[in-house]
Amino acid sequence: MVKLSPTLGRKLAELGSIIPGIQGVVYGIAIIVIILLAPEGIYWRVREWLARRTAPIKGTGAWAPAAPNVASVVPIAEPRGQTTPAEGPLLRLQAVRRTFGGLRAVDDVTLDINNGTIHGIIGPNGAGKTTLFNVINGFLAADSGNITFAGTTLTGLKPHDVCRHGIGRTFQVVRAFPRMTVLENVVIGAFVGSTSNAEAERLAMTALDRVGLADEQAYAIAGGLTTKQLRLMELARALASRPRLLLLDETLAGLGHDALEDVLRIIRQINRDGVTVAIIEHTMHAMVKLVDRFSVLDHGKLIADGAPADVVKDRTVIEAYLGRKWMERAQDSVA
């Protein structure tokens, strides 16, 4: 219940004797104003405001790593005590299968994701792309086949163990903690590769800096972020674990042209910094400009694998997206 000062309450009471029901109108207006200006609630709006007021200035606050620590924080692709081959496959899948009852969602898929590349995983809806990612990072167990990462077998490992080996992941739908700050959301991803809270916060802020959210936005409440900011926050959360391989599941979904170009630029820079990227996406015009190689799934099977210029012309790929009947009609019209 909203409490009024004695003077204001007395004035409303006097006004209520002149205009019956005016108190309800005032309360209604107050509620509408709060809903419009602070939909998350007054407490969380004040909390965000205070967080911004007390946020350390970039480069001078408690989060800023001292000079000796920068080298250990900035190269997020650093393999945490392991070595990564300079060339060849970083991730290798051999005859990987995952079924749900009688449905083969991933049907004996064999493919390599080479170190240092941006690898696109494409296919129509229901092709098995996200299921493949879920099998790679341990959310789902493979029924058969083998998965190796930098020479280490991942088959059968739990998600947190896969993450510790150096694989980060984003998801189709961003699951933020809406009443926590952006920094607090990202710190959660940093704990897997840190030994203290202070180190986790440094890793998180470095990751936020890489995606352009390190200043005041780091202390904003996550529930008030735009779609682009949510996507970048989740990308930073994955980067905070210092992965060697990033699995991006429709990171470009829901973005306008300018926002999409910004995110593409960030992904390219992450790759130039040494992180291998595998990305699922339906925005083909963006993917063709972004990736080095395509793997195409349809009904769980790998139907094409190669350079973008070759894959987009592949008859099997076109048929998978548009359907056999459309292809036949197109051929008839040409004939």
Show where each model-derived region lies.
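Intrinsically disordered, low-complexity regions
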Residues: M1, S5, I19, V70-V73, ...
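Transmembrane alpha-helices and adjacent helix-loop boundaries
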Residues: M1-P65
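Intrinsically disordered, low-complexity segments enriched in small/polar residues
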Residues: T7, P39, I57-G59, P79, ...
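Intrinsically disordered, low-complexity segments enriched in proline/serine/threonine
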Residues: L8, G41, A67-V70, A77, ...
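ABC-family P-loop ATPase nucleotide-binding domain
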Residues: Y43-R97, W326-A335
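Glycine-rich phosphate-binding loops of nucleotide-dependent enzymes
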Residues: P85-R92, V96-A335
